[in-house]
């Protein structure tokens, strides 16, 4: 009877371990995917500058209470989409902090965006991050370059790191499964 109780407890704990493993793996994949560069092709339709502090854009409801910086925002109409398929990008220097893009040229990119906006040129923008209107999150722009109408938006680095990351997690999951099988054999 004691053997059956141990086996039931082990099988339940194995499900819990794999549940925790899946949660950690999913969070890790989303985290890595968030910081990998992504390419989007479209037309720059607008730009703006907002003075911000650590709490976000400065306004009458959020007065400045510390050091402030200018954050550039660039609007992009995505190529091949309808008029509602737009993307707003934050254009902020990362300097030498996380993520390590070592980006110091936000003012230069802002000037390029204004140039391409006036000439209505098709551009390819590189960015990382996600857009969430609920949390006021914007992807951060890392590069702007002119594009032609058949250019690919596929990023080989993004594909490589996503596949590598998933392969590592599959390996860890396989090792975890084999370890639990060994423990189950020892219970028998």
Give the predicted meaning of each segment.
Residues 48-146:
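Long, solvent-exposed extracytoplasmic domains/loops
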Residues 30-56:
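Alpha-helical transmembrane signal-anchor/signal-peptide segments
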